[in-house]
A protein has these predicted regions:
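Donor-sugar nucleotide-binding helix/loop cap in glycosyltransferases
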Residues: 1-402
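Catalytic core segments in nucleotide and nucleic-acid processing enzymes
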Residues: 385-585
């Protein structure tokens, strides 16, 4: 079975371009004829499938392999700007500097069409074709009432659209960051959002308008991108309008305020759509199209999570169910889960746009769900050690927000260093009572925090195979420690140490990673010998448990700093030996997963 990710869409904006993709499946439509008689013959060579594409576009009922639609990536010897046209959707969509698009936008538009129900996708054959609604849409006149009605039905069937509309319902504008933090599955890879106060802090340090716009457009989490993409659709439909919003925050006792242009407010037309979402009075509620794929994206156990959540939704559609009932319902299907995990999934269903009613501690999905099926090839998937340990930690977090479970995923994702630093800083300064921030720039530590007289210099390291603390990075920590001692702008003009208040006089350092390997303890001792400052290493799971001890009040903040005064790895007492063995197995498992995703053997 081909690996396709339907249900979440980025970087596909224009509804008019989506219509071109839909119309290519309608024989003898203007787009279909343009492709058959002009664009495909001119833009696609025989090597990349020209004749096969023309033949597929000439069938009475058009079914086209996904790969033929999407095309190939950039071949060896080419760049993205001059890569040859190799897919039908590539040819259907004009690019900015050439007559066709690359495979990435082509894939995004296909996923968009499938996600809103205008295209059907056959998993068995890996082919796309027009849905009944898509065929109706392909026949409509641009700007007609019929077109508007079909788009309403298509977009209101897409749960994330409904989620964003409901977030905007009270007419107060929200920024893409405020929407993004409330969109997606809780504490899971694939759903990150940049804390808005970090954006405000960053904007305060930039005066150049071009650089400010670059910060706002380039600094996004995945959920922020989903929010921005979906809001671009809603703007075209007239359901929301884009506005400037002035936002303020206090960080380390300093106030930051600025205007964020990527902010959105619901319109009167949008408020009428809310009535369809809720099924109020004569406004019929539109069934929700839920793709199996959208129930998890980047998580290592995504197929297992998708199956588990599919079973949940099946159980919740028929009647109100308690957590205990859902737990037993899963057990019958060979899945063992805690009530804590089930509760997080229920909250996440609300976050993706499904309507969950609660009555006397029982839950029910009030939407009619269509399109949700577990693929035949993926009926029985075992739970990995990675998910076992994550859910074990979930049960132990009674005070810390479960969204920080995302740190466990990020600690093993070498492509997510920035997010790992940001979420570590958020855990310490927003969830807990530390002051400080992520610095994470050239010649600065990743994170610095303090409490009372005690300060901690932190280096985050996300590595798929665990982190051994090479000597070069030990040297880097030594430089930070010595710069903090000297505090001279001639040594480092950025003066990062000003993050600490003058009253902070006791310092330690910490390395934070998913897992530590090799001779890292030797390097910890080396740093101490050279600087006379002690530190420690702490893996993500122990960091979360440390946070739980602090937030619950079972541990004092001075006691917390003592853990980083040993030149050793930090182990929190609640982290049992059997947890540790599973964690080591998890690290190996995550390394294999990362290798399979990135072509590493």
């Amino acid at each position: 079975m081909a690996e396709r990710t339907f249900g979440w869409v980025q970087e596909a904006y224009k509804i008019s371009s989506l219509k071109r993709v839909i119309k290519l499946f309608l024989l003898n439509s203007d787009v279909n004829r343009e492709l058959r008689f002009d664009k495909i013959p001119r833009l696609v060579s025989q090597e990349y499938g020209r004749d096969a594409f023309i033949k597929e576009l000439s069938e009475e009922r058009i079914h086209i392999p996904y790969q033929h639609l999407k095309g190939k990536g950039t071949p060896k010897g080419y760049t993205r700007s001059n890569a040859p046209c190799s897919g039908i959707v590539q040819a259907a969509l004009p690019g900015q500097r050439k007559e066709y698009q690359s495979d990435w936008p082509a894939d995004s538009f296909l996923r968009w069409g499938v996600s809103v129900g205008l295209l059907d996708y056959d998993r068995q054959s890996d082919e796309c074709s027009l849905s009944e609604l898509g065929e109706q849409y392909a026949h409509t006149e641009d700007g007609s009432d019929e077109e508007e009605d079909i788009l309403k039905r298509a977009f209101l069937s897409y749960p994330p659209v409904c989620r964003i509309m409901l977030l905007l319902e009270n007419s107060e504008p929200l920024t893409k960051f405020e929407i993004g933090e409330q969109l997606g599955f809780i504490g899971e890879a694939g759903f990150t959002s940049i804390p808005q106060h970090l954006i405000l802090q960053g904007l305060s340090e930039i005066s150049d308008a071009k650089e400010r716009n670059k910060l706002l457009s380039d600094t996004e989490g995945t959920s922020d991108k989903y929010a921005r993409t979906i809001c671009s659709w809603l703007k075209q439909l007239g359901w929301v309008t884009q506005v400037n919003k002035t936002v303020s925050t206090i960080l380390n006792e300093e106030e930051y305020s600025d205007t964020i242009a990527q902010s959105y407010q619901i319109t009167l037309k949008g408020l009428r759509m809310i009535k369809h979402i809720k099924g109020i009075s004569k406004f019929a509620k539109i069934p929700k199209r839920v793709m199996w794929d959208m129930l998890a994206t980047k998580a290592i156990d995504r197929d297992y999570l998708r199956n588990r959540r599919t079973h949940f939704l099946n159980a919740l559609q028929s009647d109100f169910r308690s957590l205990a009932y859902l737990q037993k319902y899963l057990e019958v299907r060979g899945i063992s889960e805690s009530e804590s995990t089930i509760a997080d999934d229920l909250s996440s269903f609300d976050n993706i746009g499904l309507s969950i009613a609660v009555k006397q501690n029982q839950y029910k999905v009030t939407d009619t769900i269509v399109g949700l099926r577990i693929p035949a090839q993926i009926q029985n998937i075992a739970k990995s050690d990675f998910s076992i340990i994550k859910d074990n930690i979930r049960r132990k977090l009674q005070y810390v927000n479960h969204k920080y479970l995302l740190l466990i995923d990020l600690g093993f994702d070498s492509d997510s260093n920035r997010d790992y630093e940001i979420q570590t800083a958020e855990l310490l300064t927003t969830e807990l009572a530390f002051k400080g921030a992520r610095l994470g720039d050239t010649r600065k530590p990743d994170v610095c925090v303090y409490y009372g007289e005690n300060g901690l210099i932190i280096d985050n390291k996300a590595y798929s195979k665990g982190y051994s603390l090479p000597m070069s990075q030990a040297d880097e920590m030594v430089r930070y420690i010595e710069e903090n001692k000297a505090r001279q702008s001639s040594i480092n003009p950025n003066q990062w140490w000003k993050i600490f208040e003058d009253t902070v006089c006791n310092f330690n350092y910490a390395f934070v990673s998913g897992e530590f390997t090799g001779g890292f303890k030797d390097r910890l001792n080396n740093i101490c010998e050279r600087t006379r400052v002690s530190g420690g290493a702490i893996n993500t799971i122990n960091l979360l448990l440390l946070a739980e001890e602090l937030k619950s009040g079972r541990m004092s903040y001075p006691k917390c700093f003592s853990y980083f005064d040993t030149n050793d790895e930090v182990h929190i007492p609640t982290y049992r030996d059997d947890d540790y063995e599973i964690h080591r197995s998890m690290a190996a498992e995550k390394s294999v997963e990362y290798g399979s995703q990135h072509g590493v053997n």
